[in-house]
Amino acid sequence: MTTPSPSDALLIAGKRYRSRLLTGTGKFKDLDETRLATEAAAAEIVTVAIRRVNIGQDPNAPSLLDVLPPDRYTLLPNTAGCYSAEDAVRTCRLARELLDGHNLTKLEVLGDERTLYPDVVQTLKAAEQLVADGFEVMVYTSDDPILAKRLEEIGCVAVMPLAAPIGSGLGIQNKYNLLEIIENAKVPIIVDAGVGTASDAAIAMELGCDGVLMNTAIAGARDPILMASAMRKAIEAGREAFLAGRIPRKRYASASSPVDGVIG
């Protein structure tokens, strides 16, 4: 039996991770639920919205770092809520200052409040500036294969195409675009946004994605802790299925028991 080995680890910016499930820290009812869900997901990389979550900006308020310490988790500060390259770059620099020179960041520059689709022009502009400034950029983008390749060429360490609009729970809406991105990439491709349940995560991994990032699908579930556990198992199952190789789709039946050698 073949099982994923340590050499199958997710590699981002030179660091290896056992878990291919990345989780967010927003929308939970409190910090304790955030901690429990993160543990149930077995996530190693957790995203933090610098403009919304306290990681030291307010010394008088509870800090996320109290429940998700940086010596145990890789914190991935993100630019959620930014609508221009300038705001995104400024937010990343603030995060680097708060986290003592931490360069890994998740870039997202939104186009409008209704769809939360990425503004690809501003995203490209911000990515170029951040890479030049020494940041290791994981970038949220559309499922456009040409744009994904351009972001890779700029120097982003991971490209994160959406499966569907943020928080929609619609699942993967265009798997053929996603496949095109995966097949032409030389950096990790991590689905970001749109996952609604465990089967969505499994499908993303079966397609060959390197990982999945989610927040609402877990935090918005009736039982976030149980859903985090389900997502962990789905990611693992999807990855194993991808490595094992699915059978070809056929129009007609194919008997599982051969005719040759039938008794009688």
UniProtKB/Swiss-Prot annotation:
It is found in: Cytoplasm. Disulfide bonds: none annotated. Gene3D superfamilies: Aldolase class I. Keywords: Cytoplasm, Schiff base, Thiamine biosynthesis, Transferase. GO terms for cellular component: cytoplasm. Its EC number is 2.8.1.10. 1-deoxy-D-xylulose 5-phosphate binds at G167, A193, G194, N215, T216. It catalyses: [ThiS sulfur-carrier protein]-C-terminal-Gly-aminoethanethioate + 2-iminoacetate + 1-deoxy-D-xylulose 5-phosphate = [ThiS sulfur-carrier protein]-C-terminal Gly-Gly + 2-[(2R,5Z)-2-carboxy-4-methylthiazol-5(2H)-ylidene]ethyl phosphate + 2 H2O + H(+). One of its GO terms (biological process) is thiamine diphosphate biosynthetic process. The active site is at K106 (schiff-base intermediate with dxp). GO terms for molecular function: thiazole synthase activity. It is an enzyme of class 2 (transferase). InterPro entries: Aldolase_TIM (IPR013785), Thiazole_synthase_ThiG (IPR033983), ThiG (IPR008867). Pathway: Cofactor biosynthesis; thiamine diphosphate biosynthesis. Pfam families: ThiG. Belongs to the ThiG family. Homotetramer. Forms heterodimers with either ThiH or ThiS. Catalyzes the rearrangement of 1-deoxy-D-xylulose 5-phosphate (DXP) to produce the thiazole phosphate moiety of thiamine. Sulfur is provided by the thiocarboxylate moiety of the carrier protein ThiS. In vitro, sulfur can be provided by H(2)S. This is Thiazole synthase. The gene is thiG.
